[in-house]
Amino acid sequence: MNCKIVGYEFKSLEVILAPGETFYGERRSIVYVDAAIQREVEFNATSNGVAGKLGGIVKSALSGESILILKFYNPTSTDKKIVLSGSCCSLFPIKLQGESLICRKGLYVASTNKLQLNINLTFSGIIGGFFQKMTGEATVFLDSFGTPIEKHLSVGEVLDVDENH
């Protein structure tokens, strides 16, 4: 799989899927997809069964993400292209290696593997609200206003971040 951010002022994500590869994206992020790419709608749920799906629906509604996520699959013998974009002007890739990322709700655009998407409710100081928590092993592409600031926290270190940034 080859992922490349293209564009100058308004960024898009070009994904070349080799035969047999999969990719995940937010339903509203599609710009265009080669016709041969199979798309499968999956529930954004962390567990199976009715209770897991209902929990996924509630979490999705609170986190600002779609209840459904798209799984793209290339069933052909040649490379195929997907182009995705966020609603803002920039995309920011972050590689997760089994750890969690907490960010503003609604920023998830796509990922190289399926992630566990949850809500993170925060009541810290005067700032509180619903944030989104992503956990798994994937490169995640987030919607971004301007240039993001990446901050790795030490054990026990805490930052108060306004939910609008």
Residue ranges: model-predicted function:
Residues 1-165:
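Phosphate/adenylate-binding glycine loop and adjacent helical scaffold
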